[in-house]
């Protein structure tokens, strides 16, 4: 990265930020789709039932913890790979 000029560094940073936003939106979309499908069953009311709300809270918490754990493992493996070089 030190070999890039200022403009190239800015372009690179912008690409990284765009990728991060895209990844975040993909994660959020997956979370919404999965938890909605698993938890929301009653369409006779505008409001969620207490059971559905509880399910959604647990589902989203579990999904985010899983995603965080996968990210940590990826970082650990990446660090181990970099040490081998």
From Swiss-Prot:
It is found in: Mitochondrion inner membrane. A motif (Twin CX3C motif) lies at residues 35-59. Its main location: mitochondrion. SUPFAM superfamilies: Tim10-like (SSF144122). Coiled coil: none annotated. GO terms for cellular component: mitochondrial intermembrane space protein transporter complex; TIM22 mitochondrial import inner membrane insertion complex. Keywords: Chaperone, Disulfide bond, Membrane, Metal-binding, Mitochondrion, Mitochondrion inner membrane, Protein transport, Translocation, Transport, Zinc. It is a peripheral membrane protein. InterPro entries: Mito_inner_translocase_sub (IPR050673), Tim10-like (IPR004217), Tim10-like_dom_sf (IPR035427). Disulfide bonds join 35-59, 39-55. GO terms for molecular function: metal ion binding; protein transporter activity; unfolded protein binding. It comes from the Eukaryota. Pfam families: zf-Tim10_DDP (PF02953). GO terms for biological process: protein insertion into mitochondrial inner membrane. Heterohexamer; composed of 3 copies of TIM9 and 3 copies of TIM10, named soluble 70 kDa complex. Associates with the TIM22 complex, whose core is composed of TIM22 and TIM54. Interacts with the transmembrane regions of multi-pass transmembrane proteins in transit. Mitochondrial intermembrane chaperone that participates in the import and insertion of multi-pass transmembrane proteins into the mitochondrial inner membrane. Also required for the transfer of beta-barrel precursors from the TOM complex to the sorting and assembly machinery (SAM complex) of the outer membrane. Acts as a chaperone-like protein that protects the hydrophobic precursors from aggregation and guide them through the mitochondrial intermembrane space. Belongs to the small Tim family. The twin CX3C motif contains 4 conserved Cys residues that form 2 disulfide bonds in the mitochondrial intermembrane space. However, during the transit of TIM9 from cytoplasm into mitochondrion, the Cys residues probably coordinate zinc, thereby preventing folding and allowing its transfer across mitochondrial outer membrane. This is Mitochondrial import inner membrane translocase subunit TIM9.
């Amino acid at each position: 990265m030190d070999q890039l000029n200022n403009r190239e560094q800015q372009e690179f940073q912008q690409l990284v930020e765009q990728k991060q936003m895209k990844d975040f939106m993909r994660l959020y979309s997956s979370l919404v789709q999965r938890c909605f499908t698993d938890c929301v069953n009653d369409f006779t009311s505008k409001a969620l039932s207490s059971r559905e709300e509880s399910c959604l809270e647990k589902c989203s918490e579990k999904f985010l913890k899983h995603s965080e754990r996968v990210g940590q493992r990826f970082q650990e493996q990446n660090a181990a790979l970099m040490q081998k070089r």
